[in-house]
Amino acid sequence: CTFLGLDEHANDAFPVNCTSWQGASEICAAQGKRLPTEAEWEYAASNAPSEGAYPWGDDADVCNHAYVGRSSFAEGGSIACHDAGTVNDVGPSIDGMPGDLSALGIKNLAGNVAEWVQDDFALYDADCWKYVTFPLENPRCALGGDAQADKALRGGFWSASPFYARAVVRNLSDAKSPSAPAGVRCVKSWGP
């Protein structure tokens, strides 16, 4: 975990990981911000407005774009990226990869740490997704609110298979349990 305590600053340049959903929400609230919705996150990660497979577009050479598969225990049963960078069993990188950049100028959406989003995790045939009204305007799945056990995580992370770098891939974790790959990206709404 990158956070070592309030008085220890050795890892301040690293992205915060090992967060719970509640902890990530509190970090954002302390800054006057919030977690993005899944829809906002996916829009940013799909090379908007072009709707690519990855934040950088459709180039499938994930290992040379995103900080994923960098651990000797890369998850997901797919190809590891050890040959494209160093093995890191400890955690995220300070800078991620320079190629992991969206058209909106957002860095590290495909790799480094996975990111909590506001939404409860539910399959797309669940009620929270079935009854959305059209046109869609930032839909959010809220089955049980803050009490919901599983929350959605988006994006790849340093020990994940390159599969997780795709903008449309969803993951989940227990909202109350800190997770080593889980980090936080805060957003602020436009307007008043």
Locate each region found by the language model.
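Short, P/G- and charge-enriched loop/turn segments at secondary-structure junctions
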Residues: 169-175
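Functional-site microenvironments in short loops/helix caps that host divalent-cation chemistry
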Residues: 1-168
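Polar low-complexity intrinsically disordered regions
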Residues: 147, 175-176, 192
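Short, structured beta-strand segments at or near domain termini in extracellular proteins/domains
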Residues: 179-192
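Residue-level signal for short, function-critical loop segments
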Residues: 100, 171, 190
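Conserved strand-loop elements at the edges of beta-sheets that form or border functional pockets
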Residues: 18, 177-180
